[in-house]
């Protein structure tokens, strides 16, 4: 990894940092016991490269979103493009993921955050899962090598020491978690954003949620959905139509009320000074817009 950023290296770098590879970061095997807080300054890459790695890379699993940020930085360094812009013609557009609000949060360095901050619709997540299920093929075109998807969706590092729920210590691939159900793997995000790929069942489940207990989502799939899966298609047209009608009726109504209360005048278009802090932020401003608030 150091070879990609020779101008950002500390002197001297940590010995284990010198051994760190892209593969180690893909499978969360940096050798770090904690995710380094690289966001203390605006130079995230430099802070990561200066962080300490106590264990041999590849010997210890620890979930590390900052490592995924560095993967994004590597892609930008090699291609000269943001990950979002690199993927648009190669992945997003072929899959029909072309929402005008497709967005990826960036660091102060102008690099897509990688490990978080990608805004997608639930339908887009489902398309990504179907793409993985089809081993990188979409509408007759092979967009990604099947061998890569096979490796990404298979255990590349042991995470059995990872405390917590059952589905969090079944192994980890290239940015994908292995699940307790045979052959199933998933991408997941904070508070229950899921893309669950089930090759044996030829099925994908996409979820967006806001839960503190992310395990509830998976338990619902294992306990309620999988037992009802059959190899044959529904032969009862009336039952099929009933299912479709039920699905179309499931929605969360919009919250009623005004977009902003009377207190908006107290903070809208105001700037506030901020005391000394680790993030180096010295002021904040708020601006009310049509669809939300800009900070």
Model region roles, listed by residue range:
Residues 52-57, 67-69, 106-114, 180-184:
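Flexible glycine/proline-enriched surface loops and loop-helix/loop-strand junctions
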Residues 277-295:
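N-terminal glycine/threonine-rich, aromatic-flanked beta-hairpin/loop signature
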Residues 99-101, 150-207:
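Active-site Gly/Thr loop motif
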Residues 25, 62-92, 96, 124-135, ...:
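Alpha-helical scaffold elements that line and support the substrate/ligand-binding pocket
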Residues 215-282:
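Short, gly/Ser/Thr-rich active-site loops of penicillin-recognizing serine hydrolases
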Residues 1-28, 50, 79-115:
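Active-site helix/loop module of the DD-peptidase/beta-lactamase fold
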Residues 9-35, 56-57, 66-67, 120-123:
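Conserved catalytic neighborhood of penicillin-recognizing serine enzymes
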Residues 94-153:
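Active-site-proximal binding-pocket segments
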């Amino acid at each position: 990894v150091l070879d990609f950023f020779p101008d950002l290296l500390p002197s001297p770098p940590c010995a284990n940092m010198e051994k760190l590879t892209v593969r180690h970061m893909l499978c969360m095997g940096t050798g770090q016991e904690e995710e380094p807080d690289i966001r203390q300054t605006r130079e995230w890459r430099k802070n990561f490269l200066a962080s300490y790695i106590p264990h041999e890379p590849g010997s210890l699993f620890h979930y590390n979103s900052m490592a995924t940020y560095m993967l994004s930085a590597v892609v930008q360094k090699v291609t000269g493009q943001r990950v979002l812009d690199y993927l648009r013609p190669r992945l997003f557009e072929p899959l029909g993921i072309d929402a005008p609000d497709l967005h990826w949060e960036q660091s102060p360095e102008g690099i897509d955050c990688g490990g978080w901050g990608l805004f997608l619709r639930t339908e887009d997540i489902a398309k990504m899962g179907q793409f993985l299920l089809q081993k990188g093929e979409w509408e007759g075109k092979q967009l990604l090598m099947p061998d890569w998807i096979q490796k990404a969706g298979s255990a590349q590092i042991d995470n059995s020491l990872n405390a917590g729920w059952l589905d969090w210590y079944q192994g980890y691939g290239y940015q994908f978690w292995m699940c307790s159900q045979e052959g199933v793997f998933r991408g997941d995000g904070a508070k229950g954003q899921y893309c669950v790929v089930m090759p044996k069942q030829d099925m994908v489940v996409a979820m967006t949620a806001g839960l503190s207990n992310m395990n509830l989502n998976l338990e619902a799939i294992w306990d309620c959905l999988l037992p009802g899966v059959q190899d044959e298609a529904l032969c009862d047209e009336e039952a099929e139509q009933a299912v479709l009608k039920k699905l179309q009726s499931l929605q969360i109504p919009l919250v009623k009320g005004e977009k902003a209360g009377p207190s908006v005048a107290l903070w809208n278009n105001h700037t506030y000074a901020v005391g000394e802090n680790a993030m180096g932020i010295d002021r904040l401003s708020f601006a009310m817009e049509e669809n939300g608030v800009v900070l």
